[in-house]
Amino acid sequence: MKSSTNMGNWSQKNIYSMTIKVINEEFSICKLKDYAQIDIREPFVFTGSTDEEKSLVCPTRLVPSELLERSDGWKAFRIEGVLDFSLIGILAKISVILAENGIGIFVVSTFNTDYILTQTDRFEEALRLLSNAGYGVQYANSR
């Protein structure tokens, strides 16, 4: 999550007027033994390696056959544009709106932006709640 102690020129209104873009994929979150079967050239493949585990978030169609655990049934959207590291509260605002309505999230951050995943059965509700809060919702072209 990008954070800082200074919001710069951004106001509360700017945070709520941001656009989120729906990613037209079903996602899975996996725990792996290794990354041997992962093709990182594919879009929307996120890996994380710690001293305790190796994780993968990717389109369900790309889940490797050899894995330790998996959670299917996720949909994702991203915050459109490149987020400056000095901006704070962007992810917090989204997570509060969804948490107040009982919608859990899984977040992946990249250098440019944040990707927010929710369970598929709550995804449209999440988009509606964010739209009602002033976020623009942009749908991606179909694959």
Regions found by a protein language model. Name each.
Residues E53-C58, T113-Q119:
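A generic structural motif
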Residues N101-I116, R122, A140-R143:
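A cross-kingdom feature marking solvent-exposed beta-strand/loop segments within repeated
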Residues M1-A99, E125-R143:
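Regulatory modules associated with amino-acid/nitrogen control
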